[in-house]
Amino acid sequence: MSALGLLAMISLARPAISEEIRIGYQKSSTLTAILKTNGELEKALAPLGITVSWHEFTSGLPLLEAINVGSVDFGADVADTVPIFAQAAGAKLAYVAEEAASPSAQAILVPKDSPVKSVADLKGKKVAVTKGAGSHFLLLAALAKSGLTFKDITPAYLTPADGRAAFVSNNVDAWVAWDPFLTSASRQSGARTLSDGSNGLASYKRYYVASAAFADRRGDALNVIFNKLAETGKWVKANPKDAATILAGLWGIDAAAVEEANSHRSYNVGAVTVPGLSEQQRIADAFVAEGLIPKKVNTTDVKIWAPKGS
């Protein structure tokens, strides 16, 4: 065999240089949690020479801050508001995928025996909310619909866990939560819903986001991730009890509550388009109007990654 032929054989036998993709997720990142548990994403990425490390965050905003500073490459689903806050802070992001609207998967809760009967009754009340979360916009939208502004309440910016603790101990008058926290609290405490996002109030899409640099460099990996997320979303809807059993152990919530929470989510993963970002602009403008974002944000002025064949 010639030296050239031997060199070719050695080159073909040499394994691809391994690269790690750092994936951030939060408790409500259902599809990512399932993929982390079953190992299917690692298997699918292995032929590309890619390994995966997983990093959990309390909510979406810290996750995207980690992407912005280069600590994470890809962020599992975050609420629609989160990329807007990150964009306002100058983050270089790329939309990778979206989950179709799930308006009933977030809501404003009050204790079952609360004298608060409507959103209008929240005037002067203390409300727990996670800053920059989708529920933050739901609160703004619900207040506006009732003739109130954000300045008419006293916000308590808390993580989901701290928000729930404050809620059950009656340290706040209301709590704006999303699933699975929402359903779990409602079932355990009998909390009442003042408003969810239905009837056009807040669509509550969820987005998968990568750093713009990673999207430019590893579109092949994003294609694999996109396809696996779409497959897993379909599986969850087709197998609600099996999905609930897996997630119950991960979330520390009983399977019946998980199944109910999952029924509120679409888990319909698709490509992000400019027309599909129309509500993002409405959300951004609402936060600017309340002085919660310092300057106008053009929500289409961001990279949109497109899956192969879209």
Each model region followed by its residue ranges:
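Short, glycine-/small- and polar/acidic-enriched structural segments
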Residues: E19-T149, P155-Y157, D173-D179, A202
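Bacterial N-terminal signal peptides
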Residues: S2-S11
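Short, solvent-exposed loop/beta-turn-alpha elements that line the ligand-binding surface or hinge
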Residues: E42-I50, N199, N268-G276
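Secondary-structure end/capping motifs
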Residues: D216-L292
